[in-house]
């Protein structure tokens, strides 16, 4: 018989940087999950992506065991990295803070493809371009 699912926990944690402090500890503690075990597994799995923020969906079962699935980093984080910025614009309509090329947008779209509900890379590119516009980043090319 399959284990009964108690709940899902969605978090965004820096790769290789999960620790029992908030937000990880309280979120997992409420469901009775072994926090240190999750931290060890997550850090081991995300070590190669150090410096990125990784969304993770943790499935908690009735016997307090868990599984987790890591997603690709948010498009906004990838855009900031490509444009070599600290953060997006506070007024995206007025001040533009950076530029990315069509090739960079395509690279991000291809990386994000498994997590987006887009059927084609072109549709994924348009989603990434929309994120860039809302952050005050212009697309060249």
UniProtKB/Swiss-Prot annotation:
SMART domains referenced in this protein's UniProt entry, alphabetically: RL11
One GO location term (cellular component): cytosolic large ribosomal subunit
Keywords assigned by UniProt, alphabetized: Methylation, Ribonucleoprotein, Ribosomal protein, RNA-binding, rRNA-binding
Highest taxon of the lineage: Bacteria
KW ATP-binding (keyword) present: no
GO biological process: translation
Gene3D superfamilies with a match to the protein in the record: Ribosomal protein L11, C-terminal domain, Ribosomal protein L11/L12, N-terminal domain
CDD domains on file: Ribosomal_L11
Post-translational modifications: One or more lysine residues are methylated.
SUPFAM superfamilies (alphabetical): Ribosomal L11/L12e N-terminal domain, Ribosomal protein L11, C-terminal domain
UniProt key word rRNA-binding: yes
GO molecular function terms attached to this record: large ribosomal subunit rRNA binding; structural constituent of ribosome
UniProt family annotation: Belongs to the universal ribosomal protein uL11 family.
Subunit structure: Part of the ribosomal stalk of the 50S ribosomal subunit. Interacts with L10 and the large rRNA to form the base of the stalk. L10 forms an elongated spine to which L12 dimers bind in a sequential fashion forming a multimeric L10(L12)X complex.
Role, per record: Forms part of the ribosomal stalk which helps the ribosome interact with GTP-bound translation factors.
Protein name: Large ribosomal subunit protein uL11
């Amino acid at each position: 018989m399959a284990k009964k699912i108690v709940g899902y926990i969605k978090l965004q944690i820096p790769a290789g940087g999960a620790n029992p402090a908030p937000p990880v500890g309280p979120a997992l503690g409420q469901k009775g999950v072994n926090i240190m075990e999750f931290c060890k597994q997550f850090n081991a799995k995300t070590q190669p992506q150090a410096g990125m923020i990784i969304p993770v969906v943790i499935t908690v079962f009735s016997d307090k065991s868990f599984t987790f699935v890591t997603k690709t980093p948010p498009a906004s984080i990838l855009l900031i990295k490509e444009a070599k910025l600290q953060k997006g614009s506070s007024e995206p309509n007025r001040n533009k803070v950076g530029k990315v090329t069509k090739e960079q947008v395509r690279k991000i779209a291809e990386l994000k493809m498994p997590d987006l509900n887009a059927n084609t890379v072109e549709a994924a590119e348009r989603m990434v371009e929309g994120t860039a516009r809302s952050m005050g980043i212009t697309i060249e090319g």
